[in-house]
Amino acid sequence: MNDYHAPRNLLENKVILITGAGDGIGAQAAKTYAAHGATCILLGRTVSKLEAVYDDIVNAGHAEPAIVPLDIKGATPNHYQQMAQTIIDQFGRLDGLLHNASILGHLSAFKDIDPQEWQDVMQINLNGMVFMTQALIPALLKAENASVVFTTSSVGRKGRAFWGTYAVSKFATEGVMQTLADEYKTKNVRFNCINPGGTRTNMRAQAFPAEDPNALKTPEDIMPTYLYLMGDESAEVNGESLDCQPK
């Protein structure tokens, strides 16, 4: 999908929430969506990073985004319900949701997985994603044509040694997406996954410290697929898992 050329007004008048919007793919997605007409809601745990993305968007002349400082690790379903009501009160609807926030944890043998780290990865990569989506469904249903995009990984389709915790969280992500896609297939909201592939991010450097980052795609390079799934040109795509860098 990276040969997709999005019209500049692809996301005009759309309200899109991006999690993990402070850096990496999330920050680039927010800036790209804003450049294509969206009003972005920037969610992340580090206010200074969100403010930097906010400044980039405003200085580029795009719609002023909203900032939601939230640490998914400590958030409860009640936090998400309150956020959802605020979005409805302020914007009336939610047209798009990009679940980008996730953590890797440490790669280790399955027998050595730390129980607390397992809980932390599942809280951020799975539980927070599930409860946030659950809370936001009423706002999504108020949109004319809403899109929810989950972030997956190749290890969420085929398990790999030493990737146990992260892989299980991404297998679960695929399952959540498929379940929701089937439940809402007759409604005005669609659910899909996106696999960014090897990309020049901090998480990639953590997983592959010896890898040359200059050999990898940048977050900007993979944005066409992110635009495609969020825009109305993918309105008939539901329950799919797309690769930004197909082999």
Annotated model-derived regions:
Residues 38-53:
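Conserved glycine-rich Rossmann-like NAD(P)H-binding loop of the short-chain dehydrogenase/reductase
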Residues 158, 179-189:
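Active-site-adjacent segment of SDR/Rossmann-fold oxidoreductases
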